[in-house]
Amino acid sequence: PRANVRFNPTKDINLRMSYSSGFRAPQAFDEDLHITAVGGDVAIIQISPDLKEENSQSVSASVDFYHRFGPVQVNFLVEGFYTDLRNVFILEEIGRDEDNNLLMERRNGKGARVMGINLEGKMAYSWMQIQAGATLQRSRYKEAEQWSENPNITPQKKMFRSPDVYGYFTSTFTPVKRFSASLTGTYTGSMLVNH
C-alpha cells in the first residue's frame, strides 16, 4: 500500500509526504550471477530453505520550490527519505563444490535501514536548461553480516554496491534554432563490493 499527501501553502511551494510498504519474494537475482561471472568465478547460488520474503516500510517528505525570476524559471527540491527493511536478503559464501565452483546461499539478514536526503535544482532560460541533483544516503544492515567464509574478512554493516553519495547533471544549450548541444554527467561515490 501507498499513501501520499500534498499541500501547497503558496503557489510556488509544494509540500509532499509519502508512506509505502512492500515486499520482495524469495529469489536469486540475475545481477548476482552477472557480478560473480565478471569477477572470473563461477558461482552457484541456492536459496535457503528458510528464506522468507523481504518487507519494507518507507516514509519520505519533500519541499518543492518553483519560481520565475524574470525570464529564468527555477525549481529546487529537498527530499528526505527513510526505509526500514526486515528479513533483508543477503548473499553468503558457503564453500566450493567438487568442481571448485563458488557456492553461495541467499539468506535473510536481520534487517537494514536506508536513509538520506536528495537535492535537485533546475533552471530554464530561453536557450538553456540545466538540471543537477545529489543524493546523500546511509545504507546499513542492523547487524554486521558475515559475507565470506574467510575468517580474515570482517563482517560488514555497510551494504555492498550502495554508495553514500551519488549525483547527476544535464544541460542543453540551443543558441540558434537549428543547433542544440547537450552535456551530461553522473557521479557515483565509493562503495564496498564483495569479491
Predicted regions and their residues:
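Hydrophobic, lipid-facing positions within transmembrane beta-strands of outer-membrane proteins
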Residues: 1-5, 47-49, 57-61, 76, ...
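Gram-negative outer-membrane beta-barrel transporters
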Residues: 73-85, 89, 101-195
